Every structure is written in structure tokens, then in C-alpha cells.
From Swiss-Prot:
Belongs to the CysZ family. The keyword Transport applies. This is Sulfate transporter CysZ. The keyword Amino-acid biosynthesis applies. The lineage of its organism: Bacteria, Pseudomonadati, Pseudomonadota, Gammaproteobacteria, Pasteurellales.
């Protein structure tokens, strides 16, 4: 069921992400994710251009002759599916490569919001955390990969693969974008992946709204170069205002998808 308050708050956190990347104390931590994002997007664009024609021909071969009158619509949906599959590839690589930098950016944003240090700032401490961050990215990949494979297999089914699959793929992409970027502040506090996933699922409309805006902006030229640090900043604000008090200092507590959070933001007035 659509929750209008969560819809509003998801939009709010995305907009606030743009505000934070302009803050003086955060700019130097924003630069590296932007550079990495630019390199990865250029590589993705080259791969997409070189493979899109053959990929479209392959998908259209599964459309029966009696549906040829819908070829334009089905072609559009097929292209959307291919775009989203390429997008999964991009987010997977970017997650592994940029994880240490995004984790550090999330730390700095949280410190700006709360005035409290999370971890030591020494280079040795940061390097010590890198294996844990990469293991977390691998955990996200293990969570998403079976679903991606299932969507890929469904795309072989005539009509279903060109109509329902694009919608499911888009919704799953929105969900994964919320998980991808919210995970950085959660992981900084060593909150487990399952607890994080269930917490986000408890406010699913907010998560899907935030993830949907991130997904859409990834396909907009120029804006997509900035979207990674924007999403990290917005997700960190979401963590501080929704989950930090409940999870950040009570890691041993079991958090199920049925648990309700009633967190009110003194800064924004948004009520969940």
C-alpha cells in the first residue's frame, strides 16, 4: 500500500543529497566517487552502444508473429530491460570499486549531522575496513544475483518477457538502489545486511521512492556523473533520521520486517 508520507520523505532525502554535496566540509570526499562514477559510466556507455543492436535482435526473436502489430511497444520495453540489465552491471562494479570512498563519505555526512565520530580517521583504520566493505558488496551481489537470473529467464517467455519483466526489473532496480546506498551508513555501524534489508523493507515506499529517483537520474547525462555521492549523502540522512537511534547503538537487537519505527525528524518535520 502506498504511503504518502514515505513517498514525500523518499523524495526529500534525494533532494537533500544534492544539498550535501555542495557543503564545504564534504567536497573533497565527493570528488573521488564522481571520478570513479565518470570512468565506469563511460565504460558502460561504450559497452551498451557496442552490444545494444545484437541484444535487441536476440530479444525480439522471442516475439511470436501474431504479436507483430505490437512490435514498437515491445521493442521499447525490450530496450528498457536491456538498459536495466546493463545498469545492474554498472552498479555491481561501482559498488566494489567505490565502496571505501562511499563509506568514508557516509561517515563525514553523519559526523556533520550529529557531531559524533564513527570510526578513527587514520589511513590504517580505513584500509583495515576495506576487506569488510568488499565482503559486504559481495553479500549484496549474492542477494541480487538470483533475482537478476530469474528476471533474465522470464524474459525468454513470449509477451511476459517484453511486458511484465521490464516493470519487475525496474521495481527491483529501485529496491536495489535503496539497498546499495543506504548500506554505507548502516555498514559503518556494523549493522548486519539482513537487519538493514528488513529495516528498509519496513518503510518500503520511502525506499522505493528514493531508489527510483536514483535509478532515473542515472540515465540523465551529466546528472548521472554526480548521482553516486548524491545518493550516499541522501541515504546517510535517511539513516540518521529514521534508523540510527533504533539500530546504530543497539546492534544486538533483532529487527524483523514487522517491527514498526516511529521516528520524527526535528529538522524536517517529516513523520514516518
Amino acid at each position: 500500500m502506498l504511503n504518502l508520507n514515505e513517498l514525500k520523505s523518499g523524495f526529500h532525502y534525494f533532494v537533500m543529497g544534492w544539498h550535501f554535496i555542495t557543503q564545504k566540509g564534504l567536497r573533497r570526499f565527493v570528488i573521488m566517487p564522481i571520478v570513479l562514477n565518470t570512468i565506469l559510466l563511460c565504460g558502460l556507455f561504450w559497452l551498451f552502444i557496442s552490444q545494444i543492436s545484437s541484444a535487441i535482435d536476440w530479444m525480439m526473436n522471442f516475439i511470436p508473429d501474431w504479436l507483430s502489430f505490437l512490435s514498437v511497444i515491445l521493442l521499447t520495453l525490450s530496450i528498457l530491460t536491456i538498459l536495466l540489465l546493463f545498469y545492474f552491471t554498472f552498479t555491481t562494479f561501482s559498488g566494489f570499486i567505490a565502496a571505501p570512498f562511499n563509506g568514508l563519505l557516509a561517515e563525514k555526512v553523519e559526523k556533520m549531522l550529529t557531531g559524533e565520530n564513527i570510526n578513527d580517521d587514520g589511513l590504517v583504520d580505513i584500509m583495515r575496513d576495506v576487506p569488510r566493505m568488499l565482503a559486504r558488496e559481495w553479500q549484496k551481489l549474492r542477494y541480487s544475483l538470483p533475482k537478476i537470473i530469474a528476471l533474465f529467464l522470464l524474459s525468454f517467455i513470449p509477451l511476459v518477457g517484453q511486458t511484465i519483466v521490464p516493470v519487475l526489473t525496474f521495481l527491483f532496480t529501485c529496491w536495489m538502489m535503496a539497498i546499495q546506498y543506504c548500506d554505507y551508513p548502516f555498514d559503518n555501524h556494523k549493522v548486519s545486511f539482513d537487519i538493514m534489508k528488513n529495516a528498509l523493507g519496513n518503510q518500503r515506499t520511502q525506499s522505493l521512492t528514493f531508489g527510483g529517483l536514483v535509478t532515473c537520474c542515472t540515465f540523465v547525462p551529466v546528472i548521472n556523473l554526480l548521482i553516486m555521492p548524491v545518493a550516499v549523502c541522501g541515504a546517510t540522512l535517511m539513516w540518521v533520521e529514521n534508523y540510527r537511534n533504533d539500530l546504530g547503538f543497539n546492534m544486538n537487537r533483532s529487527f524483523s520486517s514487522q517491527t514498526g519505527l516511529d521516528v520524527r525528524s526535528e529538522n524536517t518535520g517529516i513523520v514516518k
